Curated annotation (Swiss-Prot):
Cofactor: Mg(2+)
The protein's name: Ribulose bisphosphate carboxylase large chain
Subunit structure: Heterohexadecamer of 8 large chains and 8 small chains; disulfide-linked. The disulfide link is formed within the large subunit homodimers.
EC number: 4.1.1.39
Gene that encodes the chain: rbcL
Length: 477
């Protein structure tokens, strides 16, 4: 190629590795009400300036690539590019900072969590200029959230369907989670429901294995639901796990559940995927089914504090994709989490409007407008002695899910369920009378156990149970 030709071809175009901060670091940018805002915890490689690292995150999660390309001239980068508009240090961490990035709304397909995450938490997390990257929070503007259906029904509609008000709902995961035949599984469900629980649950591992095929399980669980309803006069449910290897098979299982007339099905939304979850949520709204969500695999994504994604982001994504319940940790028990941080994302699940509050890990004010709320599910190593704390911490709009805490005392499933129901009713009554559950919780349980032999037996079984692990970092189920 002649020098003259090179000169003509290079007019307005310079190849090579470019500095991202020249285009994508815009500290003077004023965010728009329609922008999706992200807060990233960035750990750059040694020698990479914060401005360059933050700009690289904005570029690689939006319109940028590592070099200038001639097709940049065929569109408006100023209209479509992500912008790193603010950088702040992380207290106590010399090599980390929070980079705030604004994304124009037109970068994302309407009603698609899958597409949103493909951009914001896609290839940028493997970028060489970064040692680690964690998405701490997202601000979803109403202009985008209104393109999602959200939860199939929401908290108020669920209470109306169940005719249950003024208290948390009670659940139990059937154990052992694998190995029971369908008939024995259904018997365990029946005993728990007739003892006073509102729900029982398939473990997230239970799909359709050789020892118990899904159709058999659905039939025996439906029988258990109807029999317990007839005996107690209360509406009951069992979270029938519809998670499957294909979306078509998942919907087939949900259709069968609807034909049986049961009130609720279940999905593992992270292992199943957001496309499958949104598909199931739409089916559930159209067909009157509640949808319980388990978060299996979340700790792979959210456990490391420097890399991955905080669960509050996964919680927001679930509310958009759709689910009426989701597991959210306990604050107490074997999967104890930080109280303020946990309640921060619990409020993001339940409330319509949540103010920015960094002490609770909430980086942005979030307005869900009219999107229905999601019931948080507290589960993992909890038992009757935890009931006062759980009632006080989570309030009425929650599901308290006792697995081993229901099935692990010696009198049988129904008396164990009675113990949990009595403990809950005692705590709710004491709270309504103005008693302090945080200070008087143990005394409230002891008083109730005097007239409930089932609760007295449970109190004796669980009185010495503690979860203490040296050098162990807790995660939430």
């Amino acid at each position: 190629m002649s020098p003259k030709t090179e000169t003509k071809a290079s007019v307005g175009f310079k190849a090579g590795v470019k500095d991202y901060k020249l285009t994508y670091y815009t500290p003077d940018y004023e965010t728009k009400s329609t922008d999706i805002l992200a807060a990233f915890r960035v750990t750059p490689q040694p020698g990479v300036p914060p401005e360059e690292a933050g700009a690289a995150v904005a570029a690689e999660s939006s319109t940028g690539t590592w070099t200038t390309v001639w097709t940049d001239g065929l569109t408006s980068l100023d209209r479509y590019k992500g912008r790193c508009y603010h950088i702040e240090p992380v207290a106590g961490e010399e090599s980390q900072f929070i980079a705030y990035v604004a994304y124009p709304l037109d970068l994302f397909e309407e009603g698609s969590v899958t597409n949103m995450f493909t951009s914001i938490v896609g290839n940028v997390f493997g970028f060489k200029a970064l040692r680690a990257l964690r998405l701490e929070d997202l601000r979803i503007p109403p202009a985008y959230s209104k393109t999602f259906q959200g939860p199939p029904h929401g908290i108020q509609v669920e209470r109306d369907k169940l005719n249950k008000y003024g208290r948390p709902l009670l659940g139990c995961t059937i154990k052992p989670k694998l190995g029971l035949s369908a008939k024995n599984y259904g018997r365990a469900v029946y005993e728990c429901l007739r003892g006073g629980l509102d729900f029982t649950k398939d473990d997230e591992n239970v799909n359709s294995q050789p020892f118990m095929r899904w159709r058999d399980r659905f039939l025996f669980c439906a029988e258990a639901i109807y029999k317990s309803q007839a005996e107690t006069g209360e509406i009951k449910g069992h979270y029938l796990n519809a998670t499957a290897g294909t979306c078509e098979e998942m919907i087939k299982r949900a259709v069968f559940a609807r034909e049986l007339g049961v009130p609720i099905v279940m999905h593992d939304y992270l292992t199943g995927g957001f496309t499958a979850n949104t598909t199931l949520a739409h089916y559930c709204r159209d067909n009157g089914l509640l949808l319980h969500i388990h978060r299996a695999m979340h700790a792979v994504i959210d456990r490391q504090k420097n890399h991955g994604m905080h669960f509050r982001v996964l919680a927001k994504a679930l509310r958009m994709s759709g689910g009426d319940h989701i597991h959210a940790g306990t604050v107490v028990g074997k999967l104890e989490g930080e109280r303020d941080i946990t309640l921060g994302f619990v409020d993001l699940l339940r409330d319509d409007f949540i103010e920015k509050d960094r002490s609770r890990g909430i980086y942005f004010t979030q307005d869900w407008v009219s999107m229905p709320g999601v019931l948080p599910v507290a589960s993992g190593g909890i038992h009757v002695w935890h009931m006062p704390a759980l009632t006080e911490i989570f309030g009425d709009d929650s599901v308290l899910q006792f697995g081993g805490g229901t099935l692990g005392q010696p009198w049988g499933n129904a008396p164990r369920a009675v113990a949990n129901r009595v403990a809950l009713e005692a705590c709710v009554q004491a709270r309504n009378e103005g008693r302090d559950l945080a200070r008087e919780g143990n005394e409230i349980i002891r008083e109730a156990s005097k007239w409930s032999p089932e609760l007295a037996a449970a109190c004796e079984v669980w009185k010495e149970i503690k979860f203490e692990f040296a050098e162990w970092i807790p995660c939430n189920q």
